[in-house]
Amino acid sequence: MNSITLLQPDDWHAHLRDGLALKRTVPDLAKQFARAICMPNLVPPVKTVEEALAYRERILAHVPEGNNFDPRMVLYFTDHTSPDEVRKIKESEHVNAIKLYPAGATTNSDNGVSDIRKVYAVIEQLEEHQVPLLLHGEVTHNHVDIFDREKRFLDEVLSPLLKQFPKLKVVLEHITTSDAAHFVLEQDRNVAATITPQHLLFNRNDMLVGGIKPHFYCLPILKRQTHQTTLLEVATSGNPKFFLGTDSAPHAQNAKENACGCAGCYSAPNAIELYAQAFDQVGKLERLEGFASHFGADFYGLPRNTSTITLVKEDNLVPESFDYLDNQKIIPLHAGKTLQWRKV
């Protein structure tokens, strides 16, 4: 197969940041996707529908002319989120979900939920109104090994949560383990998962063997190859529980390449080509459209896109860097390497 045409894909998990960063991040994402779930972990975080709509306007100001990119907004779940905010989400045209970060789990997550039992009143409303709860699925206790944090979250947090709220709509974001894949498969249709390009294409050897490569460092961290293999199997299976979410996370080069570098891979500029490469490597390119363009929209209850994109099989050199912020650079995922697919 030398070319493939798909309904325009959506990104159900992306970080755009705010302020000057939007000049870089919004056009990069808008060239690839029709819609994106825009993460709320700003400083300060996006905690109300009003704040989300104001952030959406700041994003729209950077969408290139002639592009119909539609930012879909999310609220940041805190210990102090009001149950009434769920009703406002349900009534909003542009806000689609609420995101739970365990406090301290990832970038700008200090305001996250400290104990999920504290917010059961809000979760009751989420279940009643069928508003999706998006989960960063890791525990954050210092004594838990970083490679075990996703599995422990499933056992200690998510399993009890779904017993208490069996109809809750849940997206387990950026899954990285066989444990998470099998957990999602075992649940009813109300539980789904997103998968990033880096967790399909790479594993922890790519990050750690032959020198530490900070641009592969993200959270949840890359796992061993056996987990990567399982993620590829479920992503390419045609199962509608699994769909595209890049978790594209911009950090300036100097914030990644230092003694305590930030977590996040910037995949937005070549995201759909990265996914195409992963699907093609296992001979499942015909399954890409469902994963990228159908299943996420279906889960969120939104119409599928009607426009299309075409990918052709030809060498596509990923740039070494892009301009970012004031006189800084950002290094994209797979910088300087050649992909086999190009969006035309």
From Swiss-Prot:
Transmembrane segments: none annotated. Substrate binds at residues 15-17, 41, 136, 219, 251, 263. It catalyses: (S)-dihydroorotate + H2O = N-carbamoyl-L-aspartate + H(+). The active site is at residue 247. Its cofactor is Zn(2+). Its EC number is 3.5.2.3. GO terms for biological process: 'de novo' pyrimidine nucleobase biosynthetic process; 'de novo' UMP biosynthetic process. Binds 2 Zn(2+) ions per subunit. The modification N6-carboxylysine is found at residue 99. Pathway: Pyrimidine metabolism; UMP biosynthesis via de novo pathway; (S)-dihydroorotate from bicarbonate: step 3/3. Zn(2+) 2 binds at residues 99, 136, 174. GO terms for molecular function: dihydroorotase activity; zinc ion binding. It holds the Pfam family Amidohydro_1. Keywords: Hydrolase, Metal-binding, Pyrimidine biosynthesis, Zinc. Homodimer. HAMAP family: PyrC_classII. This is Dihydroorotase. It comes from Acinetobacter baumannii (strain ACICU). The lineage of its organism: Bacteria, Pseudomonadati, Pseudomonadota, Gammaproteobacteria, Moraxellales. The gene is pyrC.
